Amino acid sequence: MGLTTCPNCGSPNSAVKQKKNKHKGVIISIIVFALIVVSALGIGISKKAKELEYYSNMETVSFTMLDGAAKAENAGNLIKSVWYNAIYEERNSETDQYTMKNGKFVDDFNDALSELFADENFSNSISEIETNQYEVANLMKQLKEPPKKYEEAYSVLKVYYDNYLKMTKIVISPTGSLNTFSEDFNTYDNNTVDSYEKMKLYLD
C-alpha cells in the first residue's frame, strides 16, 4: 500500500496528488464530451422537428389550394355558361334562372351575371373561395424560409400558388369579354392542374 504522506517529514505524497488530478481531468473531459453529444443531438432533433412541421404545412397548403381550385373551376364554368347563354340566348336548366326573366332572355349579359352573383348559393360558393384564399395565404407565410431539404419543393410550390391565385381571382371578379375570360380561365385552370401534378412529386 502506498504512503499518502512522507514518513520523514509528514508532507503529502506528490504521486497520490498527481493521480487525483489525472482522474479529475478525465472526469471533466467525459462531462464536456457528453455535453457536446447532447447539444448535437438536441440540434439534430430540433432540425428534424422543423423539417417535419414544414412538410406538414407544405402538404396542407397543397391540398387546400387544390380544394380552392376545384371550387373555382365549378364557379368559373357556371360563369361561362351564364355569360354564353345570355349572349346567344341558349336555354339551359342550370342557367335559365339567371339569363331569363318572364320567359324572355335578358337584354344585357351583365344583367345575367349580376343575377348569378346575387344568387345565395353562388354567393356562398364565392365566399368559400375567398376564405380558401385567406387560409392559403396564411399557410404560405409560414413557408417563406424553407429548410435546405425543401428549397426545390418551395420553388415549385410558389409557381403553384401563383397559378392558383390567378384562377381564383378571375372567378371572384370576372372581367373582359366572354372570349378573353374563357381563354384566361382555361389557361389558369390547366396551369393550376399542371402545377399540382408537379407538386405531387414532393409529397409522400
Put a short name on every predicted segment.
Residues M1-K22:
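Cys/His-rich metal-coordination motifs, chiefly Zn-binding "fingers/knuckles"
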Residues I27-G42:
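Hydrophobic membrane-insertion alpha-helices, especially the h-region
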Residues S39-E53:
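Sec-dependent signal peptide cleavage junction
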Residues A118-T131:
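Mid-length scaffold segments of soluble, non-membrane domains
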Residues I129-K148:
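Amphipathic, heptad-repeat alpha-helical segments
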